[in-house]
Amino acid sequence: HIGEQLGIIPSIVEKDFWVCRVLNILFREDSLNPYLCFRGGTSLSKAYKIIRRFSEDIDVALSPHFFPELGEEDKPTAVQSASQRDAKLRKIRPHYRRMMEHVLQPLMEERMKEMGIKNVHIELEDLSTARDPFVLLIHYPSLFEQNESLYIRPFVKIELSGRAQTEPS
């Protein structure tokens, strides 16, 4: 009924609902929250209300401080040159890949299950070829025909980056 009230295609409202649900899971997780930085257009809409729009994906940066096994010398900093940061990011990329596979994907699956949400399929992009950002797709069970809106795909895309700064420079 929200779609009718706002004059918006119902599948867009549905997708926005799922984006909010996924954001809720991500940022209520104590083990992740201190290390995540919500970025991009979705943050401008959902967190800061700077723009009014419905969202399709969630852009987050994960601080290298999430990985206790990394020494300070391994972590990129804002005061380093771009080439120095890129070299360090290439070295720690495997940590981000493992985090997506062994932390984020299982976390999403577990939280969805705890909420009683069924028929959700969580798909991790092929990490053997993945570069930054790393992508996790959360396919949700749509209430609407797929052909109702061809450009509204029934999944939420999380793009997790180690490249983006999580602290002011």
Which residue stretches match the model-derived regions?
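Compositionally biased terminal segments of proteins
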Residues: H1-S169
